[in-house]
Amino acid sequence: MPEAPPLAGLRVLEGAGSLAATYAGFLLSEIGAEVVKVETAGVARQTPGEHVLARGKRSIALDASGWRALLGHVDAVLTDDSVPPPDPDPDLVRCRVFAWGRTDSRLPPEESLLAAATGVQALQWSWSRCPVWLVTPMIGYMTGILAALGVSAAFFARHRGAPGQAVDVSGVCGALALNSGTFVSGAGHRGSLSLGGDPRGVYPTYGLYPTADGWLFVGALTQVFWTKLLTALNRLDLLAHPHLQGEPMTFFDADVRALVRAELEPVFATRSTVAWVEALRAADVPCGAVGSRADFLRDPEARALGLAVPVEDPVLGPTWQPAAPVVFSDTPAPPPRPAPLPGGDTAAVLAEAPSWRRRFRASSGDGPRACLEGIRVLDLTSFIAGPFCPLLLAELGADVVKIEAPGGDPFRFQLFGFVGWNRGKRSLVLDLKRAAGREAFLDLVRAADVVVDNFRPGVMERLDIGRDRLARLNPRLVHTSITGYGSSGPLAALPGFDPIFQARSGLTVAQGGDDAPVLHMIAYNDYSAGALGALATVAALVARERTGRGQHVDVSLFRTAFAAQAAQMILFPGRPPDPRGGRDYLGPAASHRLYACLDGWLCVAAGSAAETAALGRLAGIPLTLDDPPDGPAAGALAQVLAGSPRADALARLAAAGVPAAPALAAAEIFGAPWLRASGCLGALSHPTLGPLQVVGPFIHLEATPATLGRPAPLLGADRASVLGELGYDAAQIAALVEAGAVG
């Protein structure tokens, strides 16, 4: 009989209405916590997505006295901007999820304003080099994952003697987390991934192409995949082209991009999307069909793998919804339960609550200085999704050792990006193809708590360090794998990159609207999978405190693509459409739109009739909430704002009571005083790059604070300290280096 889910026995009270906070509650429920949601009885949920996010929770109606009484019986509470934070309690984890965090901003908790003020809109690739209004609330989702991670880490720390504590997670930090590899500033560098970006993809070998009947994403990011692609297209002649002699990730120049597209577009236009997917998969080229969210939920491959599951909702009837966000080998997630009726569990919960006992209570001894203090993590990952997971674990206090092949992480060439994804870690080079390198790795495993890998399934087994062997060697080991299509199943061997799942999951179609699909500059599925991997790893550590055993944790980009758009991922007859964007999309209405000023852009988000009327007075024309983004009212306002410096325009809007924020460029992020007040910007000194400004830490914990940690390591810089801690002396280490087993 399987064990109970990782967070079984822990109770969370959710008093919040924002996407970020309710998504955090959804995730905690999905990994086993009993989440009690406070709602107004008899008031229908406003959107289909609310039925997904309320799934698995219990719903109660409470007045203020009932709220205070219930706080004394739960382990954690989730609140947002709409609810005052609860009083301190030595046994209670108090998580506040709020938009602007520790800044002094008085703006409403609007995703669009956050996206503007944190550089997210300005970074998005566009045809006209303007900022872009993003239709999918990626910031809210990432903030929710970080909040769930903070609560789980605080649970783990409390079990080890830490008190209950305040956990603060802001939308500002959520936005910056989604750009941890982009927002790195040093001498001569202020982030370049967005410069010259193409909405079809920054590299021509790694982008969207029209086919005979639709669109296709092709992911030939590396030289190996580029050669396989050209072989499949019968265009190996391009390997000899004088302008295409570098790695595909060097094909950044506009002329080179145009050259490659001119050669490839006519080829892809000759066949259907389905035919190309079949042919490219057979050639081991990463690829994916572009489709809608409804297509994704109907996808036969997704349903066969159990990633889209049927749920009978008491209001909506038969629906298809996302499966659990992650898979635990030994403590499986509970099967999905439909959303309760608002307030439907009030009587039962109030009857049970007096008998509830908190799982952990604060001890009188000294607790850990950080949530994961004393936890050793072996990081075998590369690129983005993999490294982001142990980065978050390092922020929470884990000792992370990045184990690299002799050539290093392939993304080391992304110098500042690598720094952003790999701070807080030490580096050890091991050649796992050599027996002596494997033995050194196995010695590390014996003393480790966690291994994180993002190899394709089968690679570790071929190296004789597969999960079964590691589990026998260290039964307490938590082994987290982050893959494209999962660790098992008929698709497991396929290569997977973030944009494949942007394309398949409807993300690109939603942003492009009736125009061409649009790739997001933010590697959204990568970052989400890494953050969900960190959450699942900590949850597995919590479970280990109960079971005494580790387990395997399976995170995939395919599964993440459902979970990271959970509120949009619901299918039922008559489902209303989600918002859609368009070409260089500026916003859905004149009152919710990006506008150009003399020296930059700003974002307006008037949410009431009064605010919209005030906006109209500035424009000198009547304006309503229904006025379109390209109508006369929007044109009049655009003309007024275009003649003003941005600071003056923002001051006029603020004086009129209209919410607005600057659409900051990447170069402006570290110079914004209010962003520095958020606590999510920091400084490090790198051994070769010198002083750097970076983003993080992303979660603020009162009693066991998170930290930026050390700068990203040089390749193999820590071999003496890491191996020395295992008892290797200098002569042994030198012999391993001489043999090529250690770098």
Description of each model-found segment:
Residues M1-R11, L193-S194, P210-T211, G291-D379, ...:
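Terminal low-complexity tails and localization/encapsulation signals of metabolic enzymes
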Residues A154-G197, W276, S292-R293, A540-G582, ...:
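Substrate-binding/catalytic subdomain of NAD(P)-dependent oxidoreductase enzymes
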Residues P131-M142, G164-A166, G196-R200, P204, ...:
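A short glycine-threonine-serine/GTX helix/turn-capping micro-motif
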Residues E34-V38, R281-F296, W356, V400, ...:
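Short, well-structured beta-strand/strand-turn elements
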